[in-house]
């Protein structure tokens, strides 16, 4: 209950940040437009964001007879929840995410790299983790926050260019270029910090829930160590192109050498593994 309240407050903060940007850009009219825009974004995110995220990563449905579908069916039956659809992303970097507005409309995407690098037990641990996200309804929260954060980043960049080239500082309807520059930097950072606060506690809960579903926390712990190492060594092109979706993944897919990674939406892998190993 407390975690749900915290998440509601953080999502409201993202929406408020979008409205503030609208106010700076266009006064009271801009605030109204931003508020309407936020409503449309939330509505669209609820109904369509899962489809959009899967398209971003060119995910394709797995054949019904694929062994991964057999694993997820068994896990879902064990957890007493509908069986999610499983999609494959053609990328050698091992990773996975879940999406969808509710358990009845959920999907799990895995990369070819994950299937190539992990053992069947480790794959089971990862799928159980993602299924726990679905059961906890984290999937809806994640895609909504990703959609709003992406909109904030896009508007902030547009804000900067409009303030620099579309108006001058003597125009009372314009925004001073310095304000635009500050907004470009601060708004996406603030959105990222809010996303981080939403995501971190939910990752721990999904780890624990997934371990209970699979019956062996060591499977997920072993998988996390392999995924963490690979995602520091490899470059996930689609994730770098769409950084606002990074928090959807089981392991942060953004390159570890980037400064932005200091504000990771994921808790440290070492802490996650330690908690899993302490479960039994």
From Swiss-Prot:
Organism of origin: Legionella pneumophila subsp. pneumophila (strain Philadelphia 1 / ATCC 33152 / DSM 7513)
Keyword Hydrolase: yes
Note on how the cofactor is bound: Binds 1 zinc ion per subunit.
Binding annotation for Zn(2+): 129, 133, 203
GO MF entry, a single one: metalloendopeptidase activity
Identification of the protein by name: Protease HtpX
Membrane topology: Multi-pass membrane protein
Chain's gene name: htpX
GO cellular component: plasma membrane
TM segment ranges: 7-26, 30-49, 146-166, 178-198
């Amino acid at each position: 209950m407390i975690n749900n309240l915290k998440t509601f407050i953080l999502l409201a903060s993202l929406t408020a940040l979008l409205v503030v940007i609208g106010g700076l850009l266009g006064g009271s009219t801009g605030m109204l437009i931003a508020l309407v825009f936020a409503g449309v974004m939330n509505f669209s995110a609820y109904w369509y964001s899962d489809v959009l995220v899967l398209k971003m990563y060119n995910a394709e449905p797995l054949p019904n007879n694929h062994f991964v579908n057999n694993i997820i069916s068994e896990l879902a039956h064990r957890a007493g929840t509908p069986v999610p659809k499983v999609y494959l992303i053609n990328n050698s970097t091992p990773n996975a995410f879940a999406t969808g507005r509710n358990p009845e409309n959920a999907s799990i995407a895995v990369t070819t790299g994950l299937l190539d690098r992990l053992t069947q037990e480790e794959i089971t641990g990862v799928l159980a983790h993602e299924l726990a996200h679905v059961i906890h309804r984290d999937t809806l929260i994640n895609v909504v926050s990703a959609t709003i954060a992406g909109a904030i980043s896009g508007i902030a960049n547009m804000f900067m260019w409009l303030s620099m080239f579309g108006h001058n500082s003597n125009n009372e309807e314009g925004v001073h270029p310095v304000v635009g520059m500050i907004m470009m930097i601060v708004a996406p950072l603030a959105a990222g910090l809010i996303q981080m606060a939403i995501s971190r506690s939910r990752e721990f809960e999904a780890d624990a829930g997934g371990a209970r579903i699979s019956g062996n926390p060591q499977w997920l712990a072993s998988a996390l160590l392999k995924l963490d190492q690979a995602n520091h060594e490899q470059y996930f092109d689609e994730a770098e192109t769409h950084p606002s979706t990074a928090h959807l993944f089981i392991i942060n897919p953004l390159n570890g050498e980037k400064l932005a990674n200091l504000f990771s939406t994921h808790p440290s892998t070492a802490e996650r593994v330690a908690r899993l190993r302490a479960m039994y």
